[in-house]
Amino acid sequence: MQGPLYIGFDLSTQQLKALVVNSDLKVVYVSKFDFDADSRGFPIKKGVITNEAEHEVYAPVALWLQALDGVLEGLKKQGLDFARVKGISGAGQQHGSVYWGQDAERLLKELDSGKSLEDQLSGAFSHPYSPNWQDSSTQKECDEFDAFLGGADKLANATGSKAHHRFTGPQILRFQRKYPEVYKKTSRISLVSSFLASLFLGHIAPLDTSDVCGMNLWNIKQGAYDEKLLQLCAGPSGVEDLKRKLGAVPEDGGINLGQIDRYYIERYGFSSDCTIIPATGDNPATILALPLRPSDAMVSLGTSTTFLMSTPNYMPDPATHFFNHPTTAGLYMFMLCYKNGGLAREHIRDAINDKLGMAGDKDPWANFDKITLETAPMGQKKDSDPMKMGLFFPRPEIVPNLRAGQWRFDYNPADGSLHETNGGWNKPADEARAIVESQFLSLRLRSRGLTASPGQGMPAQPRRVYLVGGGSKNKAIAKVAGEILGGSDGVYKLEIGDNACALGAAYKAVWALERKDGQTFEDLIGQRWREEDFIEKIADGYQKGVFEKYGAALEGFEKMELQVLKQEGETR
């Protein structure tokens, strides 16, 4: 038998994936179960069931049981020696809740290795479905959550986020009102991450220190459930009952929850000393896959844009999210989510290609990139010209809270004057650089105060900027990212593909079981992580003069957002 192995699971909306790594963090096996393609007997599409009438989106929990046996069978077929697996952790789609019935603990304890999980545990749930993050049925409950402590900013201050449809607190509130009898018969409530850990333990696992922050119920500064918010959420059964349902939350993200249940020992050949480590949320797991060091920034440039940062500063705002860091006490995960990302850039790319008569060109981004690189920062040919800036939202945006639309402005940093205009813009050419600048200025604006100076008299900025997703292949976008966000070490493209969450979970298991006393995740994984396998430097970061020019543009950008919000009569 060779060295120890560790498994990271990723239970996402459309699949369950398992990634097996060794102590050197090398991936040795991968097994996937695609819900639509591989499951039997569930009326799902893209992993979920949709009830349009009530804006509900949910998944059958039994589907996930079928998937877990399926993924483990896949690893068995590939020849994994399960006896070498020393630790297991996981990542779960955030915010989703699982409602266990009164027989849950007994059924988990009495699993028969000759039968499937689905056959034995389908009766373990008081409610057969788990709400998905795409669910938007809780507007009424969100309004109540936002108002309960005296406003969205107060809720964000306490729990790290204002109320969101997908967050577990508003979902539980709606659930206990819609199904009061089922709620009474619910013995425990798990998040998707702790549900996964529970299956391996053979009893219900506690919630994870980071994932619990996606509920609108956990007071981050106090490190405890917020009594007032529990009161709002609990309904007639009362606060103590809800506390029992949720259970205690251990502070250590690497705590040993216990050994694997004998079901897996007998059915697959796991060793009896295989340890279960808390599973975390998919976004927290992503920052572990890097590993993201304090003040590093990661920008996911997909259809939407997600910005993740590890920071020691807790500066909540209704437009952003803060979570406890999944492994490192004293750090937080900062997150921003935008609806308009790649789609908005593609609109302008297509308009440029149409105007140039090159719609069928083999590299659709070639013209967009060329124009972006040839255009001066903020469209200023000379310093006395006004700065061109705009907002480009083909779909309604959440940061800031605005309808779909386009707004263009000229800003004069010398006197602070701002004018909405369509004149002086050469459309769509001027919009290529303007949209990339607009997206990155918004990130810089909202992450102000979270970074420190890297030294040598440099202004506060990230150490590194990592780009992932489709947009990371684009050299022009990378160059502008470095000019606006800085990055004393540069801008890097990260190639983890779609394995980031499972990889982060596997690394978490390695750290939890191989750390020395007091050794942080960043230290242990940082020593073993071979960055040349995953990252490539694609652009310079901080450039003196350019970074400062964008600092001046930031004031105009903030004014522009506020003016458009005022015009549209919407508040953030």
Swiss-Prot record:
Subcellular location: Cytoplasm
Induction statement: By D-xylose, L-arabinose or L-arabitol.
Catalytic reactions on record: D-xylulose + ATP = D-xylulose 5-phosphate + ADP + H(+)
Binding of substrate, residues: H95, R166, D282, N283
GO cellular component, one term: cytosol
InterPro entries the record matches: ATPase_NBD, D-XK_euk, FGGY_C, FGGY_N
One Pfam family hit: FGGY_N
A GO biological process held by the record: D-xylose metabolic process
Catalytic class of the enzyme: transferase
Record's keyword annotation contains Nuclease: no
Swiss-Prot/TrEMBL keywords: ATP-binding, Carbohydrate metabolism, Cytoplasm, Kinase, Nucleotide-binding, Transferase, Xylose metabolism
Residues that bind ATP: W365, G470, G471, N474
Molecular-function GO terms, alphabetical: ATP binding; D-xylulokinase activity
Top-level lineage group: Eukaryota
EC number: 2.7.1.17
Annotated family: Belongs to the FGGY kinase family.
Biological role: Highly specific D-xylulose kinase which participates in the catabolism of xylose. Xylose is a major component of hemicelluloses such as xylan. Most fungi utilize D-xylose via three enzymatic reactions, xylose reductase (XR), xylitol dehydrogenase (XDH), and xylulokinase, to form xylulose 5-phosphate, which enters pentose phosphate pathway.
Protein name, UniProt field: Probable D-xylulose kinase A
Annotated organism of origin: Aspergillus oryzae (strain ATCC 42149 / RIB 40) (Yellow koji mold)
